[in-house]
Amino acid sequence: VGSEMCIRDRHGVICSDMPWCYYKNTKMRLFVCGAQKEYEFIRDTYGYPKNYVKYLGLTRFDGLHDFKVKENQILVMPSWREWIATPTSKSKNFDDVSDFKKTEYYQQWNNFLNSEKIKETLEKHDLQMIFYPHRNMQKYLKEFHPKSDRITIADWRKYDVQGLLKESAFLITDLSSIFMDFGYMRKPMLYFQFDMKKFREGQYQQGYFEYKRDGFGPVCEKLEEVEQELEKAAANQLQNDVEYLRREEAFFPLWDSDNCKRNYEAIKEI
């Protein structure tokens, strides 16, 4: 009587190391995982008592089996940067747009949106692209001006994230965990990771997931590589590569519409 029980059903699969999720910091009775390797990592390193961590699948995965893909739609979803979006007293304040425009983040993504080669690929293969940055970066949305009229800048107030993930045929992201949802649906993608070293030092540290070894698509560090990989994917009608499909299937051995049911039953048993 009077005791509280904490159960965690997260919004995404963890792939980096996140110390605030350690048992000593959460005291959670049930930590629900969405993937086998994630489960093994948290079980073995986060300090939870036996059977407190379970691989049940995230409840929202139940909604990722019934979808209709727009075959020519590419979704671009960059993640956020803590040192830009949530400045501390020790870091730069980027409320000034001119300061934001000096960041590598802005310059890289703006160059991406204004790439002549990407514009040509979209036109050549009759593709549409939706650029939807992380919610924390949306305050800078008006600063992005794509060269192609085939690229839509998406305001979070007008688009449903899960809807975009379900209907899009191909994903481009950097480090956003939404790639896990895309991979769960067995879809193709590529990563544009131009600032990985700074990201690891200033935001999330390396976890169990190594993008070049475990990722669900090619890892690009330069815009030229993105241009080449996107043209290659478009020429292949945005079909998934056999190797990346195999990785996706192996990463999510639980692949059904019983995620909510498993979570419900696990909670009842506590």
Residue ranges and their predicted role:
Residues 29-35, 130, 171-172:
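A short beta-strand/loop micro-motif in the catalytic core of glycosyltransferases
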Residues 1-7:
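Short, small-residue-biased leader/transition segments that mark boundaries at the very start
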Residues 40-58:
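Helix-loop-beta element that forms the nucleotide-linked donor phosphate-binding surface
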Residues 256-270:
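C-terminal alpha-helical cap of glycosyltransferases
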Residues 59-143, 220, 255:
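Conserved catalytic-core segment of nucleotide-activated headgroup transferases in glycan assembly
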